[in-house]
From Swiss-Prot:
Its main location: cytoplasm. This is tRNA (guanine-N(1)-)-methyltransferase. It is an enzyme of class 2 (transferase). Specifically methylates guanosine-37 in various tRNAs. It catalyses: guanosine(37) in tRNA + S-adenosyl-L-methionine = N(1)-methylguanosine(37) in tRNA + S-adenosyl-L-homocysteine + H(+). The gene is trmD. It is found in: Cytoplasm. Signal peptide: none annotated.
Length: 245
């Protein structure tokens, strides 16, 4: 069964976009995944096909209408039963690699792409929608965020990356940033590949990579480092309690 991506968007021509190239493109051609974008505007009910209105209480910008969004969501859920519904919004929960793996292991996702000032909040009360953020940044629309999320999922689908272990040592997979990589030439602009990587000693290489990953995480992502330290401490604490019992 292929992974089904269902973007709900005002700009369906943006899909598959860059996902029609490289690994994701080959996977699309082979049927590993498929893309079925839905035009939100098709569910407007007036002759002008209006999808947005001014914000209640005043303020800048326009807000996507709950009734129109509900029509698009209901259509997608009926056409693709069992798919989770996600909304791309900076107000959402930051996505994690663990959540990406969960999505990639499932049948696909319906992804609601925002525009303007965002969504009428009532849509989240009325429909089962997971609000997701790709980071502390603001984009002009949810389509680019949806493409990022889909790329993260598609590369994890069976056969897409070739070797099944290709994604195992990447950043975030073990709670750390990934270790640095090098390739030929051995010396470039006076900078030489670390000797340990040329030693052929796999145990030393593994230890060096672990140390480099930990150091990069500690310096660049103290939030991840703190969680990593906490995760290492919890099993040890549990073992001590078991011994005491």
């Amino acid at each position: 069964m292929s992974f089904t991506a269902v973007p709900l968007t005002l700009y369906p021509d943006m899909f598959p976009g860059p996902l029609g190239h490289s690994m994701a493109g080959r996977a699309l051609e082979s049927g590993t995944w498929n893309c079925a974008p839905v035009q939100i505007r098709d569910f407007a009910t007036d002759r002008h096909r209006t999808v947005d209105d001014t914000p209640a209480g005043g303020g800048a910008g326009m807000v996507l209408k709950a009734d129109v969004l509900a029509g698009a969501i209901d259509h997608a859920m009926k056409a693709h039963p069992g798919l989770p519904v996600l909304a791309m919004t900076p107000r959402g929960t930051p996505i994690t690699q663990a959540r990406v793996r969960e999505l990639a292991a499932g049948p696909g996702a319906i992804i609601l792409c925002g525009r303007f000032e965002g969504f009428d909040e009532r849509i989240f009360d009325a429909r089962p929608i997971e609000q997701v953020s790709m980071g502390d940044i603001i984009l002009s629309g949810g389509e680019m965020a949806a493409l990022l999320l889909l790329d993260a999922c598609i590369r994890l689908l069976p056969g897409v990356m070739g070797a099944a272990s290709s994604g195992d040592d990447e950043s975030f997979e073990n709670g750390l940033l990934e270790y640095p990589h090098y390739t030929r030439p051995v010396t470039w602009e006076g900078r030489t590949i670390p000797e340990v990587l040329r030693s052929g000693d796999h145990a030393k290489i593994a230890a060096w990579r672990k140390q480099q990953a930990e150091e990069a995480t500690r310096l660049r992502r103290p939030d991840l480092w703190e969680r990593h330290i906490d995760a290492r401490a919890r099993p040890a604490s549990g073992a001590r309690r078991k011994e005491e019992d």
